[in-house]
Amino acid sequence: MSNTTDSALWTAFIHVIQRDVQPAVGCTEPIALALASAIAASYLPAKAERIEARVSPNLMKNGMGVTVPGTGMVGLPIAAAVGALGGDPDGGLEVLKNLSSQQVVEAKAMLDRGDVRVDMQAGDEILFAEATLYHGDQWACVTIAGGHTQVVRIVINGNVLFELAPESPSEQVVCHAHDCLKQATARQVYQFATQVPFEQIAFILQAAKLNGALSQEGLTGNYGLHIGASLMRQRGRGLLVKDLLSDIMIRSAAASDARMGGALLPAMSNSGSGNQGIAATMPVVVVAEHVGASEEELARALILSHLMAIYIHNQLPTLSALCAATTAAMGAAAGMAWLLEPRYEPVALAIGSMIGDISGIICDGAANSCAMKVSTSVSAAYKAVLMALDSSGVTGNEGIVADDVDQSIANLCALACGAMRQTDSQIIEIMAHKCHCD
């Protein structure tokens, strides 16, 4: 490959990372609806009196069981209400960062009056959230689709104020980055992470800072299923040994506990998901601390982890029946393997072994239990790394794993894009029946 091609690809890689690795407060599916509400509210002459919202089945799935930051409540109605009454329309995934207790009280009162309604709407968009807010005879409707912060339409009192053109400049940039990832290989991701000038990737160290703080919050607070804190207590009872594997599990799970349990601290997300960002970050941070890695080595390992996770997720639907914490942890396996043995072969071998191990974990909606899947995924990642360091791994003779890691990834993603669509529909049907949403 020529230097010119390398330069163009590396520029695209940096753009993709900066686009897909972003701070986010709260689970990003309810946050997408909160953002739509906040933007719509900014066009009303006074506070919203009533909210009508529509979301795609997958967004409904990921918004039903997760705590909305600062509220102590789960579900999309409270997300829509606090977004309308206290959200920052310019905040993106941090729309609820400055939410006040008084605004939460007002939002809960709005729900109690029955002034918030969220319906499920099937359609072509997997990720879709639309909020229509009313004040007297004034109304504003904002539609987000295709991405957690991508506003595609704004309508004020029946007048279309904004509509995203299919070939707008922003869409062209996204498509270019998407095409670059489709044409790239895992080896090129590895080469970029290990060779790009440090100053161009130093920004990724913020992921360690944000997700590390979230992990500490999860260990000291009472969030979600408090899996990280529970595992830590079992150490004191002598039921769990203090070692690198348990550190990886505990610190990753604790960050997810806080994330899904409604902490107001931001997570550094990956591919629109805080849990994916956590799974791609915390195992790498723990191993980097263990080996005494330099700041540059940590940054390169984090870039390798996050970009590999993005590279894999780029072949998946935005939301699907495949638990994406598993694919993010494949990125973490790459980062950990490089820290322990800086060669491409262990990286590729570890990813293949993970595909042969945990590829069947389903996504049954964002919830506190996601922290369990995060802990499972990161422990599998470290196990795969240990095997790879011993030149051992799942081979191309077994299951969906191929001798080539890129083909193994393609095989896994083909399942999510094909047969698992029916699985996704069945999951949504079961969950809708549980809460009488159907």
Swiss-Prot record:
What does the record list as coiled-coil region(s)?
Answer: none
User: InterPro entries this protein is in?
Assistant: Ser_deHydtase-like_asu (IPR005130), UPF0597 (IPR021144)
Disulphide-bonded residues: none
**Single Gene Ontology MF annotation:** L-cysteine desulfhydrase activity
What PANTHER family does the database record attribute to this sequence? UPF0597 PROTEIN YHAM
Q: Which Pfam families match?
A: SDH_alpha (PF03313)
Which family does the similarity line name?
A: Belongs to the UPF0597 family.
User: What domain of life does the UniProt record list for this protein's source?
Assistant: Bacteria
Q: Name it.
A: UPF0597 protein YE0448
GO BP, sorted A to Z: L-cysteine catabolic process to pyruvate
